[in-house]
């Protein structure tokens, strides 16, 4: 039996931090970028706005966890091919309950009605420009996800331009020959 710095015993050599997923869901509504938030129904940060998310079960992948938590907390039912894994947040103090690593996902969806469920007291679309003070490090997740989605959209536009010009311009050896 190994013992950690905080006195907990483990049946393996190293302590295991908790793993969570969070998902930043964007939608465009009336010319404004919106972010899907939930109001926390439990401590820590009870009553504070946060991203949909939660703890990873032992029998699911990180993507499955993000999709499950999103559906449980907002009613929004996305498919695996609609989400992107954006970044892993590992700050030592990101969760007051203990060492927690969060895998952040993101999606851009059509705007639709949502409702709070499970441990989320409410779910609501909020303008990205008017984000309230968020629980945990969720503001950083929103900013990182927005940068990521902008990059994806620029790459998509570039690929469409290359395809429209034909495959010749994709191979520099063929240019001018």
Question: At which residue positions do the language-model features occur?
Answer:
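N-terminal strand-loop-strand
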Residues: 2-50, 63, 78
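Unchanged
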Residues: 56-152
């Amino acid at each position: 039996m190994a013992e950690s710095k905080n006195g907990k015993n483990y049946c393996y050599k190293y302590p295991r931090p908790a793993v969570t997923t969070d998902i930043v869901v964007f939608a465009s509504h009336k010319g404004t970028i919106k972010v899907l938030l939930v109001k926390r129904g439990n401590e820590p940060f009870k009553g504070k706005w946060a991203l949909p998310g939660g703890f990873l079960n032992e029998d699911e992948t990180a993507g499955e966890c993000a999709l499950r938590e999103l559906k449980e907390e907002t009613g929004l039912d996305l498919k695996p091919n609609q989400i992107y894994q954006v970044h892993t947040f590992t700050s030592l103090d990101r969760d007051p309950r203990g060492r927690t690593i969060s895998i952040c996902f993101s999606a851009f969806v059509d705007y639709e009605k949502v409702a709070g469920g499970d441990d989320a007291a409410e779910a609501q679309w909020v303008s990205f420009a008017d984000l309230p003070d968020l629980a945990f490090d969720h503001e950083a997740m929103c900013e990182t996800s927005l940068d990521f989605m902008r990059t994806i959209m620029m790459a998509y536009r570039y690929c469409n331009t290359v395809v429209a010009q034909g495959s010749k311009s994709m191979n520099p050896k063929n240019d001018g020959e």
